[in-house]
């Protein structure tokens, strides 16, 4: 099974200078676990902020989420893979880098995201098809 078959095409973005509080609101409202952080300028790259980042880097340290910018704690650069990569390769990358999602990119454009749950769901679908 290929990344393009299981990727989620709905990507939620947040500005580099938005507060972590803004990110928390958006993530809770949309019931999502990560946001792509837009570059601060043309020389910067996309990043990602996750529930895990917020809990461990802000809430767990009792920092003020209204004073910290998402760009300060975003992971950069995004881990990007080709849309035709096998999900087995993606899962080994996730294990190697201890990450829960990879982004499907093409010519600096983000096409989608594959998270751990997507791989699990893809595995179920493949088994149901007799694969």
What does each model-found stretch correspond to?
Residues 1-10, 48-79, 86-95, 113-131:
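Tandem CBS (Bateman) regulatory domains
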Residues 8-17, 43:
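Short N-terminal leader segment in a subset of presequences, especially plant chloroplast
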Residues 14-32, 38-39, 80-98, 105-106, ...:
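The conserved cystathionine-beta-synthase
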Residues 19, 41-43, 63-67, 75-77, ...:
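Short, surface-exposed, polar/charged, turn-prone segments marking secondary-structure boundaries
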Residues 27, 35-51, 94, 102-117:
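A glycine-centered beta-loop-beta connector
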